[in-house]
Curated annotation (Swiss-Prot):
Expressed in nodules, but not in leaves, stems, flowers and roots. In developing nodules, expressed close to the infection threads. This is Nodulin-1. Keywords: Disulfide bond, Knottin, Nodulation, Secreted, Signal. It comes from Medicago truncatula (Barrel medic). Induction: Up-regulated during nodulation, but not by Nod factors or pathogen infection. Residues 1-23 form the signal peptide. It comes from the Eukaryota. The gene is N1. GO terms for biological process: defense response; nodulation.
Amino acid sequence: MERKTLASLCFFLIVLLAAQVVAQIVPCKTRNRNFKSACIAVSGDNEECDHDCRRVGGWYGGSCKNQKCVCDC
């Protein structure tokens, strides 16, 4: 009986650790609502978006995605 319990506990811990690793891999992105113009990466807006995300939003940075400024949280 103890072996079965120990095996179940080990399996549960492995599943729990695997779930945490998967949760950490998914990047956090949020749209910057303060960036009013269309965000076009080739026009220099990428740097403005990054700066705006860092300065105004307090995020880690940002970039243009689908003409929207998206911040990394």
